[in-house]
């Protein structure tokens, strides 16, 4: 029988003399890892499909029956989210077969959390999208007096909306979105 040391040295020598074998092993490993990741993502999407696409607490634009649904997790103080908003609007206007579901994901601090709560609290008044647009179109962070002004600009009582935004249903919704993300 061949000793373990001798076998190890033979394998090492072979790999050093044939580096293409290691490249092939690396390539196959990459393919395997990518396939496993895609499988995991697919399973996650199936498991969370209703929470992603059909949560009645979320606001969406486009036909509910659209064959294509985009789910956007966003923060009102995220510069990338603000820059993407006009493109998302153009996409939905030019493509009636696209629906966008908006998921408040306030991760950039207390001002983000308050903005998300205000937007969600305004949904019952039919003003969610107007507030949403105002927050995403604003330069920089919107909080304090600027947030109150935005709320009142759309015919709502700022103190009432801020208070409504602090309820347990909105707490649960934001928590659920964070867990989903």
What role is predicted for each listed range?
Residues 1-110, 166, 170-181:
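Extracytoplasmic thiol/disulfide redox context detector
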């Amino acid at each position: 029988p061949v000793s373990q040391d001798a076998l190890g040295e033979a394998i090492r020598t072979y790999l050093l003399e044939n580096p293409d074998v290691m490249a092939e092993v690396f390539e196959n490993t990459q393919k395997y890892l990518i396939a496993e990741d895609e499988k995991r993502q697919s399973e996650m999407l199936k498991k969370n499909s209703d929470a992603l696409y059909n949560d009645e607490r979320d606001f969406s634009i486009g036909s509910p029956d659209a064959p294509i649904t985009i789910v956007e997790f966003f923060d009102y103080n995220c510069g990338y989210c603000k820059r993407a908003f006009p493109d998302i609007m153009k996409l939905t206007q030019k493509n009636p077969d696209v629906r966008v579901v908006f998921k408040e994901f306030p991760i950039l601090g207390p001002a983000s959390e308050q903005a998300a709560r205000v937007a969600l609290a305004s949904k019952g008044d039919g003003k969610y999208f107007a507030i949403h647009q105002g927050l995403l179109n604003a330069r920089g962070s919107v909080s304090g007096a600027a947030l109150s002004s935005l709320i009142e600009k759309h015919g709502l009582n700022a103190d009432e909306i801020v208070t409504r935004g602090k309820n347990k249903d909105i707490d649960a919704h934001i928590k659920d979105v964070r867990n989903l993300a």
